[in-house]
Amino acid sequence: MRRASSCGGAVAGSPSEAQDGGEDDGSLRNDTSHMSFEELLELQSQVGTKAYKQLVTGSSTKKQSSRPPVQKGCVADKHRPLEMSAKVRVPFLRQVVPISKKVARDPRFDDLSGEYNPEVFDKTYQFLDDIRAREKELVKKQLKKHRSGEEHEKLQHLLQRMEQQEMAQKERKRQQELRLALKQERRAQAQQGHRPYFLKKSEQRQLVLAEKFKELKRSKKLESFLSRKRRRNAGKDRRHLPLSKE
């Protein structure tokens, strides 16, 4: 309350001072109105042209603002809205309400999705194998209908892709079975009091390759596999040979 009264007193005192100054300027202008032209020229030479014009016209050379002065030190209510100039340009992308940044989350690599266990995953989604088998048979039927053309190429490419995925899944299952067998063997050695032996990755790859050869031999596809491998290795060797000079 004291702050408001002090501000009010400061504002109330300013008009009286302005009124006294206005009366003095009016009396001086009345005096100059009765002076002769020679006296006015002499007065102008004494006080200067700028002061003489201000005295005769009664206006300052500087433009005075018609708005009342802003009392910066006096605040009537601190809870009132902030006054801002209407001439300030509002930004085009003004953010009124803060929006939290969206963070992309991949469930495959997120801890909230749990730890990936291939054995549990295969048991949970085992029904997908039957769906893939039915889709493969459907693609084969469609391939028999379209013997040539662009549709035939698309179906052929799709069938090859499905067969490659099936082979990769079988290979992954074979490796899982091998790891499970090694784990059971180490557990049996520990129960018998022997120190368990952990195979190196190179030894595990050799075991997987041996199992793959056994599977190919049982299915009578070993010769075709070896011939493809020999052709692939021969192509690699030719790339490393120096070019013949003509």
Curated annotation (Swiss-Prot):
Major localization listed first in the record, in broad terms: nucleus
Coiled coil: 144-192
Subcellular location: Nucleus, Nucleolus
Pfam family, one: RRP36
InterPro entries: RRP36
GO biological process: maturation of SSU-rRNA from tricistronic rRNA transcript (SSU-rRNA, 5.8S rRNA, LSU-rRNA); ribosomal small subunit biogenesis; rRNA processing
Feature: compositional bias, Basic residues: 227-246
Span of the annotated motif Nuclear localization signal: 228-231
Record's keyword terms, sorted: Coiled coil, Nucleus, Phosphoprotein, Ribosome biogenesis, rRNA processing
Biased composition (Polar residues): 57-68
Phosphoserine PTM positions: S60, S65
Chain intervals for the UniProt region annotation (Disordered): 1-35, 57-78, 222-246
Cellular component, GO, one term: 90S preribosome
Free-text function comment from the UniProt entry: Involved in the early processing steps of the pre-rRNA in the maturation pathway leading to the 18S rRNA.
PANTHER family for this protein: RIBOSOMAL RNA PROCESSING PROTEIN 36 HOMOLOG
Family: Belongs to the RRP36 family.
Protein name as annotated: Ribosomal RNA processing protein 36 homolog
